Amino acid sequence: MPHIDVKFFPRDLSDAQQQALADELTQVIVKHLQSKESSVSVALKEVQPEQWKSEVWDTEIAPQLDTLARKPGYEM
């Protein structure tokens, strides 16, 4: 039951663009984890730039920096 939680700066994506992103992310999971499409859930959340550090960096990125599969190319 893979769950993908994507946080990003506001991009003004239409509903169709958000759905396309979720669909493509789902296909990557299906391909690499051999999951069923119906087992994958995707959350897309826009985070304001001024809130990124407190909402994402401090709570999700920094605490697990050593175990991230891909580390960001920036520090805060």
Curated annotation (Swiss-Prot):
The active site is at 2 (proton acceptor). One of its GO terms (molecular function) is intramolecular oxidoreductase activity, interconverting keto- and enol-groups. Gene3D superfamilies: Macrophage Migration Inhibitory Factor. Its EC number is 5.3.2.-. SUPFAM superfamilies: Tautomerase/MIF. InterPro entries: 4-OT-like_dom, Tautomerase/MIF_sf, Tautomerase_PptA. It is found in: Cytoplasm. The keyword RNA-binding does not apply. Keywords: Cytoplasm, Isomerase. Pfam families: Tautomerase (PF01361). One of its GO terms (cellular component) is cytoplasm. Coiled coil: none annotated. Homodimer. Belongs to the 4-oxalocrotonate tautomerase family. PptA subfamily. NCBIfam families: PRK01271.1. This is Tautomerase PptA. It comes from Cronobacter sakazakii (strain ATCC BAA-894). The lineage of its organism: Bacteria, Pseudomonadati, Pseudomonadota, Gammaproteobacteria, Enterobacterales.
